[in-house]
Amino acid sequence: MAKELRFNSDARARLEQGVNALADAVKVTLGPKGRNAILEKLTGPPTITNDGVTIAREIQLRDPFANMGAQLVKEVAMKTNGVVGDGTTTATVLAQAMVREGLEAVDAGANPMRVRRGIERTVPVVVESLRSHSVEVGSSADLRRIAALAASDDEAIGDVIAAAVEHVGKSGVVTTEESDTLGMAVDVVDGIEFDHGYTSGYMVTDPERMEAVLDNPLILLTNKKISQVQEIMPTLEVAKRADRPLVVIAEDVDGPALQLLVGGNMHKTMRSVVVRAPGFGHRRVAELEDLAVALNGHVIAKDTGIELGEVTREHLGSCDRLTATENDTTIVGPHGLQNLVDARVAQLEAQRERARLDADRDILDLRIARLTGRVAVIRVGGATSVELKERMLRVEDALAATRAALEAGIVSGGGTALAQAHRALDTLELVGDEAIGRDVVRRALAEPLRWIAINAGFEGDDVVDVVADLPLGHGFNALTGEYGDMFEEGIIDPFKVTRAALESAASIAALLITTETAVVEEIVGQPGAIMAPGFGDLAEGMVRPSNIY
């Protein structure tokens, strides 16, 4: 297919148009008085949100050159969201400012490669300055303020997240779920919980609550599919002789084997429940092994060399109580040996350190939390589906910000830490066009503060000038319009979020300002193509390579 090309300042100008289009749509959401964006959906009601990455994902531009610029800034938001789950709007604003300042310098004759080098040498100095001024989270009030600020100053969200995090601690897991009821609530899981429930309603022991509750059960763990009576009979005999109910956690149980277990429940001759094993694919055996350690049992699998027909009492795990619903299972009081559980947790923590993908780390975090019994679920409800989705996005942002603060500490918020970080650059000696790169970063650092002030109805440049001369940590409160100590007023940001936003923005901006040629696919209207007023050729609907998200 033929290509369309643009060169030099023309290429950079078209790319900058896309950068500005996306950033202008996102930056109006910045700060406690930021506005919302409404996003059309092909199916269902539109989405109303102030989440930067959610807005960025929806933006595709008609001009293919401008669209490439927009996709590059979208990458900034996506990368920041992937690293810390928050700070996407700040990253987008920083990227726009660096691109604007950098392209002005290049068009004025600066060497783009030296400018890029200057940016790359400046950012680590700023990050180190931020790190040196960060402090550890000292109280639940700090957690509450961090969560509330990340959720557009919603104190209700701050209270809920602080309560959840306080219970599970730094190493625990907090998850979010949609709820059918209004408002928000925290459910604390004491023990081990996973998402699969019973496979048959005939196994329910409490019809009113539709729960199967078994006290002091024996538990069979296997990744096999059980269909024949002969496969389950040895385990049933062990449970019957012990006069204890049986729980089968397996890949699947069906056919005559399931009929036998259901019949025992209906005739009350043998109480049992079948639960589908947690995890999928290769992770299933690993998660079953976690349960085996916690329950003091063994996994019946081909890899372990134990067959279903060879099961004895020593192979079965146990706990004080197991509760299964249609959707999830909770194990309370597992009978595993604590030293073995601690060793398994240490093994999983070592795996997490080596994990490269965020998804793998999240899964390992959940497995560790299950074994340590520290899991909290925040249930979020809303009057309409639109309100529910908007609130869920804010809760997820706030939760990510809280986790980041616990991991790496906090800095003064409201854009203050970045705006005052320029002081660290006074001692950075660069020459020539590298010094221009340093000044590009210096001017961009104040941009988040400027837009927080503008969105709150104040003159952004005046606020930036005042904050630049204030003592370190003193800044502008956009809610009250007053200046003061950010830490005392509870206006704080996680250091990890601020760092990720700056590094992601600088990475893309440094690459974009070195662009000399832009190449896109040429879209040619086909003879006889359907045309519609205001829409044009149907070929315009083709997905471009730059529309990767």
Swiss-Prot record:
Pfam families: Cpn60_TCP1. It comes from the Bacteria. GO terms for cellular component: cytoplasm. The keyword Cytoplasm applies. CDD domains: GroEL (cd03344). Coiled coil: none annotated. Keywords: Chaperone, Cytoplasm. GO terms for molecular function: ATP binding; ATP-dependent protein folding chaperone. PANTHER family: 60 KDA HEAT SHOCK PROTEIN, MITOCHONDRIAL. Belongs to the chaperonin (HSP60) family. This is Chaperonin-like protein MimG. The gene is mimG.
